[in-house]
Amino acid sequence: MPAVNLGMPKVPEVLAPRRKTRQISVGKVKVGGNAQVSVQSMTTTQTTNINATLQQIAELTATGCDIVRVAVPHQDDADVLHILAKKSQIPIIADIHFQPRYVFTAIDAGVGAVRVNPGNIRKFDDQVGAIAKAAKAAGTSIRIGVNAGSLHPSLLQKYGKATPEALVESAVWEASLFEEHDFHDFKISVKHNDPVIMVKAYRLLAERGDWPLHLGVTEAGPAFQGTIKSATAFGILLSEGIGDTIRVSLSAPPAEEVKVGLQILQSLNLRERKLEIVSCPSCGRAQVDVYSLAEQVTEGLKHVNVPLRVAVMGCVVNGPGEAREAELGVASGNGRGQIFVKGEVIKTVPESEIVQTLIEEANRLAAEMPAGSIGSPEILV
């Protein structure tokens, strides 16, 4: 039987075309328009601890983060932004609450963007004209960051709580103020900790204008819960073409947020797939240690920078057929594994040698592919 490539197609399919938006720049990163969906995170260090903050930014950059946000709760934090902006490998967004003067300090510091919270910055509406003028002169973009937890009291009184309509009304009002001052380089977020309310809010917002949208489920929770919430909400919106940049909020190290965000985008074919482990959940038919094989293969191939799909199959029900139709595969059973290359068995090895043999063959195939290519090889274990 001829081998069939089950890897990524040359032009990955998506569920819906991207929503058409204006494009802005956050430093060197384009957001909206035809730019890829970018992944953001936020540092957890004290911003004034320059070395620790830059170290965390470097770790985020290495993980694949495109844009990083830093907290600016005090004047001392605002005063070090110029150092961070100069030394960071990726654009910095200054996160501003309460004090409008920090916005101007951040713009002068050369950050990529400033996040403003219209719900809690003092007399924010009166400051929009000056902020727009300063940001436009510096080439700094703005994120209008509406959050259910800090919605303006007048909107809470009007709607009774942070409804999708309340979040959108706040965002659209502030957007109109910036546009009145001929400032259009902004994106918008309307975050809520309930994925259902969040999805409804973004759908409403997407109908109101062509602004780039930053997706986020605020206060999503610990790693497991937060991953589920974010994947659910982002999956719905991105599959509808809504969303231009994302941040997965987790009570976990920031690098984990980036890993989850990238995986969500890859799962929707909005980012090129790299290493992907497809493993069976194991059952009473399994004749090898599926869990161990999956973990060892993941570790052994983590350096690979071309699309590799690795499926860990633990029994003879699906293993041989799947392996024969893959570029590279292993059909496991009875303490050994048959190694397939392009549908042909090239060797049978003991179970103890399956992982090493697979990694060697995978590296050989990967070396034949240019970095960043889309397509085979697919690997099945």
Swiss-Prot record:
Pfam families: GcpE. GO terms for molecular function: 4 iron, 4 sulfur cluster binding; 4-hydroxy-3-methylbut-2-en-1-yl diphosphate synthase activity (ferredoxin); 4-hydroxy-3-methylbut-2-enyl-diphosphate synthase activity (flavodoxin); iron ion binding. Pathway: Isoprenoid biosynthesis; isopentenyl diphosphate biosynthesis via DXP pathway; isopentenyl diphosphate from 1-deoxy-D-xylulose 5-phosphate: step 5/6. The keyword 4Fe-4S applies. Binds 1 [4Fe-4S] cluster. It comes from the Bacteria. Its cofactor is [4Fe-4S] cluster. Gene3D superfamilies: Dihydropteroate synthase-like, Sulfite Reductase Hemoprotein, domain 1. Keywords: 4Fe-4S, Iron, Iron-sulfur, Isoprene biosynthesis, Metal-binding, Oxidoreductase. Its EC number is 1.17.7.3. InterPro entries: Dihydropteroate_synth-like_sf (IPR011005), IspG_bac (IPR016425), IspG_bac-typ (IPR004588), NO2/SO3_Rdtase_4Fe4S_sf (IPR045854). It catalyses: (2E)-4-hydroxy-3-methylbut-2-enyl diphosphate + oxidized [flavodoxin] + H2O + 2 H(+) = 2-C-methyl-D-erythritol 2,4-cyclic diphosphate + reduced [flavodoxin]. [4Fe-4S] cluster binds at residues 280, 283, 315, 322. NCBIfam families: ispG_gcpE (TIGR00612), PRK00366.1 (NF001540). Belongs to the IspG family. This is 4-hydroxy-3-methylbut-2-en-1-yl diphosphate synthase (flavodoxin). The lineage of its organism: Bacteria, Bacillati, Actinomycetota, Actinomycetes, Micrococcales.
